[in-house]
């Protein structure tokens, strides 16, 4: 059972998955909020609440969530995005904590893209450390256009819909700069792993 939990966050296209993969190579369990978010919107009470708020047009013909339709709606409307987060975040938080505590390791990483937007440590008081993957906004923009084939306008909207780089850095206990050099990412992971293992033994 892990009694030391690190929250990993960063902006869209910052390289959170790449950093999480480096920790996994060292045997560290990683609980992914994106995966948990997909699980909690499977047919059930959370999906029912989403449909009640946004209408049946956010469902596919098989009764599952049409993620693309819902994503387009909430990115276009800040108020609707907040409504969606109010429905999904409590269920996601609960499952993330349960999975992290159940991990059989000295510590666990919980990857939470919207950690800053959800109030940082106030929203997740059970986190022992917050690790931020930092990347210049221009590089985020470039990666979104390459990775997701996003238009420049959509990339701007996706970045603007999240917390600012400065807001993320303000909640960080630890920061890793991910400018695309894998060797530097690996070195940073090894350094942090040693630190977290030492802290978990205290």
Swiss-Prot record:
Binding site for ATP: 13-18
One Gene Ontology molecular-function label: ATP binding
Domain of life, source organism: Bacteria
Catalytic activity: 3'-dephospho-CoA + ATP = ADP + CoA + H(+)
Protein localization: Cytoplasm
Group of enzyme by EC: transferase
DPCK domain residues: 5-202
Record GO cellular component, one term: cytoplasm
Gene3D superfamilies: P-loop containing nucleotide triphosphate hydrolases
Pfam families assigned to the protein according to its UniProt record, in alphabetical order: CoaE (PF01121)
InterPro entries tied to this protein: Depp_CoAkinase (IPR001977), P-loop_NTPase (IPR027417)
Metabolic or biological pathway, per its Swiss-Prot or TrEMBL entry: Cofactor biosynthesis; coenzyme A biosynthesis; CoA from (R)-pantothenate: step 5/5
Gene Ontology biological-process annotations: coenzyme A biosynthetic process
UniProtKB keywords: ATP-binding, Coenzyme A biosynthesis, Cytoplasm, Kinase, Nucleotide-binding, Transferase
EC number assigned by the record: 2.7.1.24
HAMAP family linked: Dephospho_CoA_kinase (MF_00376)
Reported function: Catalyzes the phosphorylation of the 3'-hydroxyl group of dephosphocoenzyme A to form coenzyme A.
Family: Belongs to the CoaE family.
Protein name, as recorded: Dephospho-CoA kinase
Encoding gene, per UniProt annotation: coaE
């Amino acid at each position: 059972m892990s009694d030391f939990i690190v929250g990993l966050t960063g902006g869209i296209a910052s390289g959170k998955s790449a950093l999480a993969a480096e920790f996994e190579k060292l045997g560290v369990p990683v609980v992914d909020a994106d995966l948990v978010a997909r699980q909690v919107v499977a047919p059930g009470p959370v999906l029912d609440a989403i449909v009640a708020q946004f209408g049946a047009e956010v469902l596919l013909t098989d009764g599952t969530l049409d993620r693309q339709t819902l994503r387009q709606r909430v990115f276009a409307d800040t108020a609707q995005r907040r409504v969606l987060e109010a429905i999904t975040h409590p269920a996601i938080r609960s499952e993330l904590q349960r999975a992290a505590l159940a991990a059989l390791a000295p510590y666990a990483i919980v990857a939470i893209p919207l950690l800053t937007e959800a109030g940082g440590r106030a929203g997740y008081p059970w986190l022992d450390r917050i690790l931020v993957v930092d990347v210049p906004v221009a590089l985020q923009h470039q990666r979104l256009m390459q990775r997701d084939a996003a238009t420049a306008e959509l990339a701007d909207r996706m970045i603007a819909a999240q917390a600012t780089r400065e807001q993320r850095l303000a909640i960080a206990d630890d920061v890793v700069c991910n400018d695309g050099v894998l060797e530097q990412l690996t070195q940073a992971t090894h350094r942090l792993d040693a630190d977290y293992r030492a802290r978990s033994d205290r």
